[in-house]
Swiss-Prot record:
Protein name: C-C motif chemokine 3
Source organism, top-level taxon: Eukaryota
Major location (coarse): secreted
UniProt signal peptide: 1-23
Assembly behavior: Self-associates. Also heterodimer of MIP-1-alpha(4-69) and MIP-1-beta(3-69). Interacts with CCR1.
Organism: Pan troglodytes
Chain's gene name: CCL3
Annotated S-S bridges: 33-57, 34-73
SMART domains the UniProt entry points to: SCY
Xref: InterPro entries: Chemokine_b/g/d, Chemokine_CC_CS, Chemokine_IL8-like_dom, Interleukin_8-like_sf
Length: 92
């Protein structure tokens, strides 16, 4: 009976360590960040969706997803970017 208790204890410790390891990996998961913005306005009909970058990024950004599957970094303080985001929210 002691062997099965010891085996159970080892199993529980192993599971706890695995959970800690996977939790730390999830916290370090890379996120999409922008280091520069597009210099010109892109046509709104090219845009399919958008998301905002993580607060962990050094530069706040909006990333537009085009209908062709490309990601375009844009400055969230630009008026056209705010309009596109607003329009996408209304159409969702």
């Amino acid at each position: 009976m002691q062997v099965s208790t010891a085996a159970l204890a080892v199993l529980l410790c192993t599971m706890a360590l695995c959970n800690q390891f996977s939790a730390s990996l999830a916290a370090d998961t890379p996120t999409a960040c922008c280091f520069s913005y597009i210099s010109r306005q892109i046509p709104q009909n090219f845009i399919a969706d958008y998301f905002e970058t993580s607060s962990q990024c050094s530069k706040p950004s909006v990333i537009f997803l085009t209908k062709r599957g490309r990601q375009v970094c844009a400055d969230p303080s630009e008026e056209w970017v705010q309009k596109y985001v607003s329009d996408l929210e209304l159409s969702a």
